[in-house]
Regions:
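S-adenosylmethionine/decaboxylated-SAM
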Residues: 2-12, 18-200
Length: 200
């Protein structure tokens, strides 16, 4: 698997963490499809896609594509390339579609909805859920509560941006991680700020 080709894709997934995503996707997708919350332009999605291909599994990736709080105008991660002047809003969907076609990652299925709304209509089990959407505590915890029951026993929950020290980063993903450990999950593996938990 040549995953170095994803290095230049717009996104916030460091290569060594993306490499871990690919490995976990390859392992857990043997038992079913994978669901990602928080697509942005699809960098992490491509890592997941590459790992799942050998098992002929799909990656369902959910995002409203109007950006998180930090992507908006005058915020830290505002990016002119994904700003749609015709609507005066962030729109990362066109770049995601471009990346899917560029890398022929046709096992990626974009879902343009709010995560919690999509979960209400979702009935199929998944082998792995990757939470990397909004990093507010309410949103991150809602993502966990909405999708936790969809993960099969022995499946994986992956959470990005885990910082024990508040000075290094936001605490919402870390709180969700600790909550999951108290609610049916155990540590499986960690690479820097991305952690994989296994569901009992």
């Amino acid at each position: 698997m040549n995953i170095k080709k994803f290095t230049g894709v717009k996104g916030f997934m460091p290569f060594h963490e993306g490499e871990a995503l690919t490995k976990w996707a390859s392992l857990f997708s043997k038992n079913g499809p994978i669901l990602e919350i928080g697509t942005y332009c699809g960098k992490s999605t491509l890592f997941l896609s590459e790992g799942s291909k050998k098992n002929n599994q799909f990656i369902y990736t959910i995002d409203h594509h109007t950006g998180s709080e930090e992507h908006q105008i005058n915020e830290e991660y505002f990016d002119e390339e994904i700003f749609d002047r015709s609507t005066n809003k962030i729109n990362s969907l066109p770049l995601l579609i471009k990346n899917i076609n560029l890398f022929k990652a046709y096992n990626i299925v974009p879902i343009v909805r709010e995560s919690s709304i999509a979960a209400k209509d979702w009935s199929s089990p998944v082998s792995m859920v990757f939470i990397d959407g909004s990093h507010s505590l309410d949103s991150a915890m809602q993502d966990f509560k909405s999708w936790n029951t969809k993960i099969i026993s022995g499946g994986a929950l992956v959470i990005h941006d885990i910082y024990e020290n508040p000075e290094e980063g936001g605490q919402a993903p870390y709180h969700v991680y600790k909550h999951a450990l108290q609610n049916g999950y155990i540590d499986f593996e960690r690479v820097d700020t991305i952690v994989c938990l296994k569901k009992l």
